[in-house]
Amino acid sequence: MSRRLLTLLASALALLALWPLLQLLSQGLQGLQQGLVQLGPDGGRQIRGTLLLLLGSALGGTVIGTANGWLLINCRFPGRRWLRIAQLIPLATPAYLLSATLVDLGSRAGWRIHGLGWGIAVMALATYPYVFLLSTESFGMSGRRQLEACRSMGIGPWSAFRRVALPIAMPAIGAGVALMGMEIVNELGAVQLLGIPSLSAGILDAWQSNSDPTAAISLALVTLVIVLGLVVGERRLRRRSRRWSDGVAGGDATAWPLHGTRALAAQLLGLIPP
């Protein structure tokens, strides 16, 4: 009896959680039947702004997260352990807070912090830890044999990264980029503060400012399609990453020691993004 009650309660909670989505789909289907689906006067610009923000931030986050992931896993230098922990700090800092801080500092210095370029920088710095976490997991699984084989052939750490570790880690990096994209598409505060036309801001403006629920629903459906695509891509890439990891010889990797200017450069590279 208690198990049946728990099942009913779980079903009711699931229905409540899915109810807004079902309403959205119902309104969208009615609009399709009546030919009323329209994106509003700025819908195309908002979709383009979201896609550009997504692509630019994904590129920046991939470079930062992957480079730091390889450096902090497979190179040995003073402060490496603390820098690995520091890479997670952006996850505790909302993108809106980061953009507001930049706008405030820029206004005091006479700079205009506004537009797509700054939005890409903010979102890349706020979300790159997703790529960092998954890439470090993959790099850590690359194992001793691969790195020792590179050393025996006289290949340095960055050449080993480019030739061996990066191809193996690509599915994990792609999954991290998909997680980045889900957060970027749903960001509202930062894009409004920086004046970037986006789907999230467009939905709010269409519903509240323009009193156009049809356009708001249409934009929400476009957002839903993008997010579903990212979810499906993340799941597939995560499974592919596991298959790659299962087929790669494991073991504790021997880190390359860095000294002098190389160690200082590694410390700066790991310290600047957080």
Question: PLM features: what roles do these ranges have?
Answer:
Residues 75-79, 140-145, 155-158, 209-213:
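Juxtamembrane helix-boundary/capping and inter-helix hinge elements in multi-pass membrane proteins
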Residues 30, 34-38, 84, 107, ...:
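Short amphipathic alpha-helical coupling elements at transmembrane boundaries
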Residues 25-35, 194-200, 241-250:
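Peri-membrane helix termini and adjoining interfacial loops of integral membrane proteins
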